[in-house]
Swiss-Prot record:
It comes from the Bacteria. Belongs to the universal ribosomal protein uS12 family. The keyword Manganese does not apply. InterPro entries: NA-bd_OB-fold, Ribosomal_uS12, Ribosomal_uS12_bac. One of its GO terms (cellular component) is small ribosomal subunit. PANTHER family: 30S RIBOSOMAL PROTEIN S12 FAMILY MEMBER (PTHR11652). Part of the 30S ribosomal subunit. Contacts proteins S8 and S17. May interact with IF1 in the 30S initiation complex. HAMAP family: Ribosomal_uS12_B. One of its GO terms (molecular function) is rRNA binding. This is Small ribosomal subunit protein uS12. It comes from Francisella tularensis subsp. novicida (strain U112). Residues 102-124 are annotated as: Disordered.
């Protein structure tokens, strides 16, 4: 336990929490332009072709973000909205593209969890 004199001379330091999504600059989402849309493979033990896009943000950062859902309409120069949220089996992918916002279409024929994929309610 520190004495009062020790604390007067050298106060306790607050631990600094490092942001997991620095490119968002403390905003919930950011707009950006796709510079490259491609597929990549996950870490072991998983196997797939994951769809990702390289995005240049309005904050000046260029980040890799994941395109969730089945099928997408993104190509180079598409304007997208990104949110935080990493993909555990893709190293360096710390952001998600928001489906159904700006140039990104929602997922077709999706019945459950529609709000996460920008899908409108089906006609009964």
């Amino acid at each position: 336990m520190a004495t009062i004199n020790q604390l007067v001379n050298n106060p306790r330091k607050r631990s600094v929490v490092k942001s997991k999504v620095p490119a968002l600059k403390a905003c919930p989402q950011r707009r950006g332009v796709c510079t490259r849309v491609y597929t990549t493979t996950p870490k072991k033990p998983n196997s797939a072709l994951r769809k990702v896009a390289r995005v240049r943000l309005t904050s000046g950062f260029e980040v890799t973000s994941y395109i969730g859902g089945e099928g997408h309409n993104l190509q180079e120069h598409s304007v997208v909205l990104i949110r935080g949220g990493r993909v555990k089996d893709l190293p360096g992918v710390r952001y998600h593209i928001v489906r159904g916002a700006l140039d990104t279409s929602g997922v077709n024929n999706r019945k459950h969890g529609r709000s996460k994929y920008g899908t409108k309610r089906p006609k009964s």
